[in-house]
């Protein structure tokens, strides 16, 4: 439940500050926020930014970065809002298909119309795009066709991307970690490179996009195997130079951070490089 998640996370944030919770965990961010950064979205807009549940509570700064990038591209943004709730991805991962379908129907009912629905979490994006298959209805298929990863949408609209005014700074090297839900499920991982190109030197891993070990709920159900898979990914990161890592999925980011990697969302790098003058 979104409200329980919000208040539970605030209690965890207090627990972290009191030293009652370990910071080095793949189950939650190293520093949970007590306050959510203020949104600049409007009540009407050209696109809907899907906020979800875990992402909205644990990584709201990514949503704010997405808003900043889209607005800098000349795009007006509105948020999906609390009535939309969870996309149902974790329910589907756990085999709770009926509950996943209920979540999917609620999401669709809360987002009628034709506005593009942009997502900044690869796992959520993959789930939303799968609604046509999950529900098998015309409504679900039409809804899924409205869904795009934020970076995918920007890459499809280069004229918008070109409008973003950037600071004149050096392009630091960053390692791109492709979430499975972006590379294999959505097959739009190249968009991350197009979006990052003007602000960073993209460093590729040599493991051909192998999983980091997070895998949705996989790291909870099979922690030992998950850590072995993560070890392989961390070795690939070391071979690539141990630069800052960018990942477009919260589960991957948390999982790699717990192993010592410095990880941010690609949109955070782009937002940071925007010239606000």
Predicted regions, residues:
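Iron-sulfur cluster-binding electron-transfer modules in prokaryotic oxidoreductases
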Residues: 1-277
């Amino acid at each position: 439940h979104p409200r329980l998640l919000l208040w539970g996370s605030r209690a965890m944030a207090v627990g972290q500050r009191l030293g009652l919770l370990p910071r080095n965990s793949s189950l939650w961010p190293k520093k949970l926020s007590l306050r959510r950064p203020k949104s600049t979205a409007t009540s009407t807009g050209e696109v809907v930014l899907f906020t979800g549940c875990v992402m909205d509570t644990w990584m709201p700064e990514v949503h704010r970065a997405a808003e900043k990038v889209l607005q800098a591209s000349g795009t007006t943004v509105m948020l999906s809002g609390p009535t939309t709730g969870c996309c149902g991805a974790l329910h589907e991962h756990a085999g709770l298909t009926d509950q996943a379908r209920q979540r999917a129907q609620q999401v669709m009912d809360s987002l009628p119309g034709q506005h593009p629905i942009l997502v900044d979490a690869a796992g959520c994006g993959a789930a939303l795009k799968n609604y046509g298959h999950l529900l098998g209805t015309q409504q679900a298929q039409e809804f899924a066709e409205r869904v795009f990863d934020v970076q995918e949408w920007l890459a499809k609209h280069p004229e918008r991307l070109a409008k973003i005014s950037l600071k004149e700074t050096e392009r630091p090297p960053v390692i791109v970690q492709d979430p499975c839900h972006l590379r294999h499920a959505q097959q739009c991982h190249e968009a991350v490179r197009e979006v990052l190109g003007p602000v960073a030197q993209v460093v590729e891993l040599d493991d051909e996009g192998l999983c980091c070990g997070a895998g949705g709920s996989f790291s909870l159900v099979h922690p030992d195997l998950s850590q072995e898979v993560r070890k392989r990914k961390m070795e690939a990161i070391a071979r690539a130079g141990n630069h800052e890592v960018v990942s477009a999925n919260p589960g991957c980011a948390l999982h790699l951070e717990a192993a010592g990697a410095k990880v941010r969302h690609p949109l955070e790098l782009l937002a940071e490089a925007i010239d606000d003058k």
